[in-house]
Design a protein with these regions (language model features):
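Short cysteine clusters
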Residues: 1-4
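Conserved Radical SAM active-site core
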Residues: 6-147, 151-156, 168-169, 183-194
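Structural beta-strand/beta-sheet cores of well-ordered domains, especially the beta-sheet scaffolds
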Residues: 70, 143-145, 172-175, 208-210, ...
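A structural motif corresponding to the C-terminal lobe/cap of the Radical SAM core domain
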Residues: 120-126, 155-237
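N-terminal alpha-helical segment
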Residues: 143, 204, 254-257
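Helix-hairpin-helix
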Residues: 236, 240, 248-263
């Protein structure tokens, strides 16, 4: 990914933890009450399958060999074998597969070695395994799955970002979509913006995401409070929508339905 400081072409010294080091550190910190769980991510080492196997082994050793009862979140490698991802889900509380960018075009331009179809297929397989486990009352990624979108590395507006999130929630039953504001990096590609987006944009997207998941708003309704497909950075999206829909107010709390009360 051209926007990542740890990309393959980046001129930085590489380092890694062995499975034993990850397990040892996690157990030691957990026993001292420094941590409540482990979030484990990795660049690709040797191959997607090798990397996914190493992550799965770390989680398995924690559970089986050390009786680790803390939270484990594994960042799965979408190109890895479905079997390895399934094995990881047996030991992790949550799996996540990064969608990275809101559009296929942006992914091709800024992360050419990643394939949107492969990412979505892997997310679909995780959802299937989670649904099967619920029906059979067995353990598989009980805290569900999540994903992440980089915001501001491409030209996509907030309407596109939220529309993608809405599809992800509906199609893959995600628990969360995380938004990460693009941060300029040294020796970056000319395809990337020179400046980072306003940090407030990330905050507004998280607020909008809450409206999407719990308040019954559609992406178009949410962005209608701003201009040009972007959220208003000065006021929260719920207030922005209300100001653009003054005809819906005031509301009589004694007779209004739940949907209107939420808004």
């Amino acid at each position: 990914c051209v926007y990542c400081i740890n990309r393959r072409s980046s001129n930085v010294k590489r380092a890694r933890f062995t499975v034993e080091e990850v397990v040892g550190l996690t157990v030691a910190f957990y026993k001292r009450n420094y941590i409540e769980g482990l979030f484990l991510s990795s660049g690709v080492i040797k191959s997607p399958d090798y990397t996914m196997e190493q992550m799965m082994l770390a989680a398995r050793k924690l559970r089986q060999d050390h009786g680790f009862a803390g939270y484990i979140h594994l960042k799965a490698i979408p190109e890895a074998s479905p079997w390895l991802i399934e094995q990881a889900g047996l030991w992790a509380d949550r799996l996540s597969i990064n969608l990275e960018l809101p559009s296929i075009a942006s992914l091709k331009a800024l992360a050419p070695e990643k394939d949107g179809a492969t990412i979505r297929t892997a997310m679909g397989q995780v959802r299937e395994r989670i649904d099967e486990a619920k029906e059979e009352r067995r353990r598989f990624s009980p805290a569900g799955q999540s994903t992440q979108l980089i915001v501001g590395a491409d030209a996509e507006d907030d309407a596109a970002v939220l529309a993608t999130s809405a599809v992800m929630y509906g199609r893959y039953d995600l628990k969360r979509v995380y938004y990460s504001a693009f941060s300029p990096i040294p020796e970056s590609s000319s395809l990337l913006p020179v400046k980072a987006p306003p940090l407030q944009r990330e905050n507004r997207l998280y607020q909008a995401d809450w409206l999407l998941r719990f308040y019954g708003f559609t992406p178009l309704e949410i962005v209608s409070g701003g201009e040009g497909g972007m959220l208003d950075l000065d006021i929260d999206p719920k207030l922005a929508w209300a100001l653009k829909n003054r005809d819906r107010f005031p509301v009589d709390v004694n007779i209004a339905d739940r949907e209107l009360l939420l808004r």
